């Protein structure tokens, strides 16, 4: 059974980290990447792309991670990759089924960090700017 993530309207929200108002592009990315709004003090917040990528970089560098091979996905997480929400470890978008298939075909592993699997989306892996971290 595929996962389901709700979509929210992020127009007019502030970034949780820098407290700047989200621009229309950041609000659209939050919605398209299926982020969830967070509430602090009863007020909803989103996340701008600059802060999100900085936090994902911090997660890759500061938190211990292990390599999770596609063949071991079910053993570790108990579900197939198609039934699991895997996000990109560079930009945070949800990986599509074809991107998860690319991981399996190319034998590119996932990062298993903080109890979650992270992979690379097509946009972050196609141009070579964002290399595989292992």
From Swiss-Prot:
Subunit structure, as described in the record: Forms homodimers. Interacts with ubiquitin-protein ligase UBE3A/E6-AP; this interaction stimulates UBE3A ubiquitin activity. Interacts with host BAK1.
Gene that produces this protein: E6
Keyword vocabulary terms for this entry: Activator, DNA-binding, Early protein, Host cytoplasm, Host nucleus, Host-virus interaction, Inhibition of host innate immune response by virus, Metal-binding, Modulation of host cell apoptosis by virus, Transcription, Transcription regulation, Viral immunoevasion, Zinc, Zinc-finger
Protein family membership: Belongs to the papillomaviridae E6 protein family.
Chief place where the protein resides: host cell
The protein's name: Protein E6
ZnF bounds (unnamed): 15-51, 88-124
Entry annotated with the keyword Disulfide bond: no
Subcellular location field: Host cytoplasm; Host nucleus
Organism for this UniProt entry: Bovine papillomavirus type 5
One Gene Ontology term, aspect cellular component: host cell nucleus
């Amino acid at each position: 059974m595929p996962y389901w993530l709700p979509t929210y309207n992020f127009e007019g929200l502030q970034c949780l980290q820098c407290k700047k108002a989200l621009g229309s592009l950041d609000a659209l990315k939050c919605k398209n990447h299926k982020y969830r709004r967070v509430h602090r003090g009863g007020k909803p917040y989103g996340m701008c792309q600059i802060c999100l990528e900085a936090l994902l970089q911090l997660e890759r560098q500061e938190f211990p991670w292990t390599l999770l091979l596609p063949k071991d996905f079910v053993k570790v997480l108990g579900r197939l990759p198609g039934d699991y929400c895997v996000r990109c470890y560079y930009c945070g978008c949800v990986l599509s089924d074809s991107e998860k298939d690319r991981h399996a075909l190319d034998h590119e592993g996932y990062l298993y960090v903080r109890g979650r699997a992270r992979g690379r989306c097509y946009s972050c892996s196609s141009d070579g700017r964002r290399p595989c971290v292992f």
